[in-house]
Amino acid sequence: MKVSVAALSCLMLVAVLGSQAQFTNDAETELMMSKLPLENPVVLNSFHFAADCCTSYISQSIPCSLMKSYFETSSECSKPGVIFLTKKGRQVCAKPSGPGVQDCMKKLKPYSI
């Protein structure tokens, strides 16, 4: 039990420090991205976890120029979704039928193993 608590504590510390280490050189882009429903990246070693489900969707059009790849959520998720990975390493959840989602998916490469 103590080992699992220690391991969980270490993982949480790494997650917090990792998110603090991100450097932003474009304040305008960061401000725009801060208004999007973002999730912390949970893709590790090319595996998708149950946490890779969308709980909410972005309401505006996907800014494709700020994205580097995407993947569709698992059929085990309660809502269908497309998770876009930003160039800054964050995730944005989008409704598959949302504005610009299909166009953006055509322009970007899917996240691959």
Curated annotation (Swiss-Prot):
It comes from the Eukaryota. It is found in: Secreted. Pfam families: IL8. Residues 1-21 form the signal peptide. One of its GO terms (cellular component) is extracellular space. One of its GO terms (molecular function) is CCR chemokine receptor binding. SMART domains: SCY. Disulfide bonds join 53-77, 54-93, 64-104. Most abundant in heart, skeletal muscle and adrenal gland. Lower levels in placenta, liver, pancreas and bone marrow. CCL15(22-92), CCL15(25-92) and CCL15(29-92) are found in high levels in synovial fluids from rheumatoid patients. InterPro entries: Chemokine_b/g/d, Chemokine_CC_CS, Chemokine_IL8-like_dom, Interleukin_8-like_sf. The N-terminal is proteolytically cleaved by proteases associated with inflammatory responses. The processed forms CCL15(22-92), CCL15(25-92) and CCL15(29-92) exhibit increase in CCR1-mediated signaling and chemotaxis assays in vitro. Keywords: Chemotaxis, Cytokine, Disulfide bond, Heparin-binding, Secreted, Signal. Coiled coil: none annotated. One of its GO terms (biological process) is cell-cell signaling. Chemotactic factor that attracts T-cells and monocytes, but not neutrophils, eosinophils, or B-cells. Acts mainly via CC chemokine receptor CCR1. Also binds to CCR3. CCL15(22-92), CCL15(25-92) and CCL15(29-92) are more potent chemoattractants than the CCL15. Belongs to the intercrine beta (chemokine CC) family. Monomer. This is C-C motif chemokine 15. The gene is CCL15.
